[in-house]
């Protein structure tokens, strides 16, 4: 007989229990999780075959991401337009610009154009004080034809060139008068700072002191000579210059005398201190002179389209010639 307290041993097969033998790590790798099993079912087609791989990537699910909160915008600051700057502010800015930049500023907007169109405004007054020598400011006869600060400043940029001058000449402290030193057997000339190639331009020339045997006023290219030995009409002696000798009233170009000017019998001689106005019309390719506001007729025609500079040449010692650019002459 068996004892009642003996435990009945039931086989594992009847309890559907697995063996208590521990599983190996290799066995765990072969076990599919429910999630993997679900994925494998989805990835298979109806016949149990894996689906065809697609080159298109599945777009990300944006619904699962939280939307970042919007940043609070700062209050809009009022924008300051350069075209609405006060005139006092523009004056402080424009005084540091060159004439070329000022011209560009005039084409920028109506406000800047109006500020710079006032020829006697504080802008031009300040620039005039900065650029113009004190000797020119104090000369009461230098700017008789020029009233505004803008025109005076423009004349300064067209004055005699200290770097384009014969070695026997020098420019006085006012910047507009050339002085010839007493050197024997020498003809000496000078050119203006800026040349002209289009438009109509007028230059007032005044000869102070004796003329000597040669005293020529006119214009030349950048290549014309400004010094030679002897006393000759240097301005007009080659094809790069055109001149009018005030001593004998003869026009010269390319070494040829073109006749007496003005074309009349016994034309009056030049008197020291008279104002001679040289007018170069680059559009019509002609040039002429005026004496005391009197038109003397066309002096030169068929002038080639070159950049032309006002010029003079002298031979008499200690004589002086003043030249002031006045812009476009008054017609009629």
From Swiss-Prot:
Gene Ontology MF term list: protease binding
UniProt-annotated stretches for the region Disordered: 1-81
Biased composition (Acidic residues): 1-10
Residues of the B30.2/SPRY domain: 138-330
Stored InterPro entries: B30.2/SPRY, B30.2/SPRY_sf, ConA-like_dom_sf, F-box-like_dom_sf, F-box_dom, FBXO45-Fsn/SPSB_families, SPRY_dom, SPRY_FBXO45
Record's compositionally biased regions (Polar residues): 15-24
Domain F-box residue range list: 79-127
Pfam families: F-box-like (PF12937), SPRY (PF00622)
Recorded GO CC terms: neuromuscular junction; neuron projection; presynapse; SCF ubiquitin ligase complex; synapse
UniProt KW Calcium keyword: no
CDD domains for the chain: SPRY_Fbox
This protein's pathway: Protein modification; protein ubiquitination
UniProt KW keywords: Synapse, Ubl conjugation pathway
Localization per record: Synapse
Assembly, per entry: Component of an SCF (SKP1-CUL1-F-box protein) E3 ubiquitin ligase complex composed of cul-1, fsn-1, rpm-1 and skr-1. Interacts (via SPRY domain) with scd-2 (via cytoplasmic domain). Interacts (via SPRY domain) with convertase egl-3 (via C-terminus).
Family: Belongs to the FBXO45/Fsn family.
Its job: Component of a SCF (SKP1-CUL1-F-box protein) E3 ubiquitin ligase complex which is required for the restriction and/or maturation of synapses in GABAergic neuromuscular junction (NMJ) presynaptic neurons. Promotes NRJ synapse development and synaptic transmission by negatively regulating the daf-2/InsR pathway in muscles. By targeting convertase egl-3 for degradation, negatively modulates insulin-like protein ins-4 and ins-6 processing. May stabilize synapse formation by promoting the down-regulation of scd-2. Regulates axon termination in PLM and ALM neurons.
Protein name (database record): F-box/SPRY domain-containing protein 1
Organism: Caenorhabditis briggsae
